[in-house]
Amino acid sequence: NINFLVNAGQGDRFVFKIVDKDMPPAIVAMEYELIEHAASKDLGFKLPRILKNRQGEIETRIKLRKNAENRARLIEFIDGCLLESRSDISQKTRKSLGKALADFDLALQDFDHSAAHRNHRWNLADAGQHRSKLSLIEDPAKRDLLAWAFDLWVARAKPLLAELPHQIIHGDAHGENILMQGESVIGLVDFGDCCFNPTICELGVSLPYMMMGNADPEQAAMDIVSAYHRIRPLSRAECAVLVPLICGRLAVTISVAAERRRIDSDHPNWFGSEDEAWELLHYLSDNGFGKGKELFRYEDL
């Protein structure tokens, strides 16, 4: 995808997004309908709504010089500061994130779309698809740690996921997709990984990024989960799979990075969280989380 910021005058700004012609139209339609549905629920934060063209379509076919046909769409621009740019994330910010994710998931509880029933490389419910990449990790100690993370996901998450509540989730709520104003979440962007999943995978994806680099990763997780729980109460079964889901997401992040390094080891955007992912995996392994330890007591939520 290629994105351009469009200044339309009088303070109006939009994002002009060009996508490959091979992007399934059903996925784009799903994103449009999902955002419209969620935005109608008065979330308290903004979503990047897609504007229709003069023909009433959400995409327009274009042809760039020397390129094949592409498709483009115009999206509302949300003015805010990326959470990723914050060097110090406060407890208030983490609680705002937990509430925002819960509000978003509640807004989608009565929404479904056939295109969301899919698999992709970042699908946390299928983290095991990347286990074959273990051989890409040359350091034996790191390879063993990564295998431990996959094993934990297989043993303590995979068998239980089918019985947990399912719905369409955002599935990619990390710092580059969360917009802030002060200490409050004001926007959620990038719906390219939305899929029908166990709802708890929303937290399973987001928590690792909020725990990475934090002096007290357990408290960071507790802040987000407790705020989420107040809006959309979690079951004990959902909480029980959080640690293995976090390990699964970290394993996927590391595995995809290892695969990408074989393609372009100098890419500026592919490896930003890799080192911190290893550090958090070490922390979880060294502190008994593979032996049944939980991030928090359910009673403390």
Regions found by a protein language model. Name each.
Residues R54, R86-K142, H166, F271:
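A cross-family kinase active-site recognition segment
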Residues G56, A68, A72-R86, A127-I137, ...:
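A glycine-centered beta->alpha junction motif in the catalytic cores
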Residues S135-L136, T253-L301:
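ATP/Mg2+ or Mg2+-diphosphate-binding catalytic cores
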Residues G9-D112:
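ATP-binding pocket architecture of kinase catalytic cores
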